Curated annotation (Swiss-Prot):
Family per record: Belongs to the PyrI family.
Cofactor: record remark: Binds 1 zinc ion per subunit.
Assigned keywords, A-Z: Metal-binding, Pyrimidine biosynthesis, Zinc
Binding-site residues, Zn(2+): C106, C111, C134, C137
HAMAP family, A to Z: Asp_carb_tr_reg
Organism: Methanococcus maripaludis (strain C7 / ATCC BAA-1331)
Transmembrane segments annotated in the record for this chain: none
Gene expressing this chain: pyrI
GO MF annotations in UniProt: metal ion binding
Protein name in UniProt: Aspartate carbamoyltransferase regulatory chain
Cofactor(s) listed: Zn(2+)
GO cellular component, one term: aspartate carbamoyltransferase complex
């Protein structure tokens, strides 16, 4: 017997779709979403492309440009849907900017940003297989630590 889960559409807010499988909770965490906001988190849902995806629906949330950049770092294929009065008024794919300031922490313990209270500045050197370089110490980082 095939079971289907019905999730009520949101009236006003944001739907983050096509999140890489098992990454919705990481997206939720980096966005610092208020716990009082109604939301639906769907994990490992089959997509039309045959791969697993996650979906995050948050009633009453408007994303900032910084939020979208954070999502792009974690799930570069994610799609953002802005909902007003039950209608999708804007839909777009996230896109990594050429430079990211202040939201990533350098993993090099000798970097000046880790010794003093300085926000990190990073260049996106390669998007398809994420390659990020610290503009202070020039180190390429493999693991992303979101600082804000």
């Amino acid at each position: 017997m095939k079971m289907e889960l019905k999730v009520k559409p949101i009236e006003n807010g944001t739907v983050i779709d096509h999140i890489s499988g098992s990454k919705a909770l990481k997206v939720y965490k980096i966005l610092n979403i208020e716990e009082k906001l109604p939301m639906t988190i769907a994990l490992n849902v089959p997509s039309k492309k045959g791969v697993m995806k996650d979906i995050l629906k948050i009633e009453g949330l408007e994303l900032t440009k910084e939020d979208v950049n954070k999502i792009a770092l974690i799930s570069p294929d994610a799609t953002i849907n802005i909902i007003k009065e039950g209608i999708v008024i804007k839909k777009f794919k996230v896109d990594l900017p050429k430079r990211i300031d202040g939201i990533i922490k350098c993993t090099n313990p000798n970097c000046i940003t880790n010794k003093e209270n300085i926000d990190g500045k990073f260049s996106i050197e390669q998007k398809n297989t994420l390659k990020i370089r610290c503009e202070y110490c020039e180190k390429f980082i493999n693991s992303i630590i979101i600082s804000k």
